[in-house]
Amino acid sequence: MSDHFQPAARLLTPFSPPPRLLMGPGPITVDPRVLRAMSAQLVGQYDPAMTQCMNDTMALYRSVFKTENQWTLLIDGTSRAGIEAVLISLLEPGDKVLVPIFGRFGHLLCEIAERCGAQVHRIEKTWGDVFSAEEIEAAIKNVQPKLLAIVQGDTSTTMLQPLQHLGEMCERYGVLFYSDATASIGGNPFLTDDWKLDAVSVGLQKCLCGPSGSAPITLSDKAVKTICKRRHIEAGIRNEHHKDGSGLRIASNYFDLGMIMDYWGEERLNHHTEATTMLYGARECARILLEEGVDNAIERHRIHGRAMTEGLAAMNMKLFGDQSHKMHNVVGVYIPDGVAGEAVRGSMLNDFGIEIGTSFGPLHGKIWRVGTMGYNARKDAVLQTLVALEAVLRRQGHGMTANAGVDRALDIYSEEGL
């Protein structure tokens, strides 16, 4: 008698992903060192080796974030988990939050804040532009928010929002300052303490050379004080010495940063079972960056990003957005007239094993996004991508000088001493 629930034989074979060079806006090809670290065997969540690994990871990410914040830790989940944990822990229903939007991920901050019950006030820029400090200050004066929430690098537009003057401004007006730096950290300058940020969340899958699945965050003393007013200890683990905060309990159990801090702190109050393999991977991502040196990594992203950008421009393609505010690690180019954008992406993937990105919303079908980030911010990856893209575009009838992209990139590398 056949088993109705027996899966097809194909489903019982191992999954073997095809070889790919991920040159889109993320995720990227993971550094082999990170994959090796993630293959290590698990230990128990209260094993001294495990808690030491957690403490070491906190210390490493303080250097990544350029901060002395005690509460620098990991949220188990994608970069969006870090965003949600920060916003739901800082915002109570009715709180006012100001979100400057210059791409898709500003809209994401708005949606999550609205789901927290906050009053969301938006200011918007045309995609491809960024805000001046004066525009944001005017909005802060008008709205008087509890929190300014802003993306630093938005991969949907490739733009990098200047943050360096916003922290002092927020401090002056009594506003908490949060940034999602998932797409930018490690490839562009980011100074948590110098820029007076109160909360930052990131992911591993861009310039940090890792897979999605862990979200490093850091919290200032001011942010921690706000969260601790809402502190809550679960009934099943609390003792007589535990006291809850006086504020409204955080609506999410999983993303309750007060409880997560108790788990990462000395008392190790049980909250969840740590995603041990992701912890190993996140630790190795930080180690790789800090061994290279943060400034050296940023310079590497600048050089390879410049080579890719100028190589694409030399192939008779128009660059998207304000180039003076572009991230080092991703560039947008308009799809040339008469060229089938998805057919080009398909040929790049199927014929060359290279992935480049499309875009979202008002830019969908109008631009490609090409990344040079993390492990793929390398000369060979840039040149391979330019060679493949030229071959595909020429078959689509796009006019350009033969080898122009690669020649220009090689000129840039010569200028940069590579």
Functional labels for PLM-detected ranges:
Residues 193-205:
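Conserved active-site segment immediately N-terminal to the catalytic lysine
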Residues 70-98, 102, 106-110:
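Conserved beta-loop-alpha segment that forms the PLP phosphate-binding cup at the N-terminus of a helix
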Residues 318-351:
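Conserved PLP-binding catalytic core of the aspartate aminotransferase-like
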Residues 131-186, 199, 207:
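Active-site phosphate-binding strand-loop segment of PLP-dependent enzymes
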Residues 19-75, 80:
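A glycine-/small-polar-enriched, mobile loop at the entrance of the PLP active site in fold-type I
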